[in-house]
Amino acid sequence: MMRKVITVVILLMGIFLSISTMALERTSLAICGDGGGWPPYHFEKERKVIGYDIDVLEAVFSPLGLTITVDLPPWQRCLRETNLGRYDIALSAAYSEERDKDYILTDYYYTLQPSYVYSSITYPEGLPIRTAQDIDGFRVCGLQGYNYTGFGVDDSKVRKNGKTFDQVVKMLEANRCDVFLARYEILAGFKASEGIDHLTNGLKVVSIPGISGDKFYMLISRSIPDGLELKSIFDQHIKQLRVSGELDRMIEKYIE
C-alpha cells in the first residue's frame, strides 16, 4: 500500500514538474489585446500597456521566468494573428462557439455586466425594453469584431461599424442607431483610467434585463505546440488567485 502511495506521489510530482519545465522551455509569451482600448483590463498609458489583464498575466507566468510582451493592434487582427500563431494569447474575449472551436479558451478570469446605452435627448422617457429580446426591435450599434451573444440579443442584427467607443457614441448622437451595446465596467474604466467620459450629452447606460454577468476568457492559439500546457498553468493559477481574493484586489486598483 505504501509503495502505491509513493508511486502516485511521484507521478503527480512528475506531472507538475513537466508542466513547469514546459513553461521554462519557452522564454517569452507574445500577447495581443484590443487596440481600441479595453480599460481597465488593458490600455496604453505613457506608451506602456497596463491594466488588470497584464497584472494577471504577470502573476501567473512571470514566476515561471517568462517575459511577457503585449501589443494592441485592431481587435480583428489580434484574433486573426492569434489564430495563426503569431500571437500566443489574445486577451479579454467573450465566449462564442466559433471562438471555442478556433482557440483554446482558458478558465474565465472576470465577469462584466452587459448593458445598453441610449440618448435621453432622443428618448427622454427611456426605451420600452423589458427583456433582452426587446432590444432586437431597435437599431443597435456595436464594435467591429465583437461578439454580443452574451448580451441576449441577436448578434447578426448588431451593426458593427464602429472601431472605437468614440465612433459608436458619435453614431448614437447622430441618430444612426437607437442604442449601442457595452459593458458598464469598460465605460467606467475609460473614465477612471484615462479620464474619458463616454456618458455625456444625455447618454444613459442601463443594465440589460434578465442578463447576468458575462464571463471573459483568454484565447490561446491552437497553432502553438504548448497551448494546452499554457491553459493548464493558467487555469490552476487563476483558481488560486480567485479563491485567495487576489483577483478582486487586482481590479480594485483600477475601479474604486
Predicted regions and their residues:
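Extracytoplasmic small-molecule ligand-binding "clamshell" domains
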Residues: L24-E97, K101-D102, G142, N161, ...
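Extended ligand-binding regions for polar small-molecule ligands
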Residues: I54-P63, Y123-P124, Y217-M250
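Acidic, polar ligand-binding/catalytic clefts
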Residues: E58, T67-D134, G145-Y148, K204-I211
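Bilobed "Venus flytrap"/periplasmic-binding protein-like clamshell domains
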Residues: G36, R47-A59, S119-S156, K170, ...
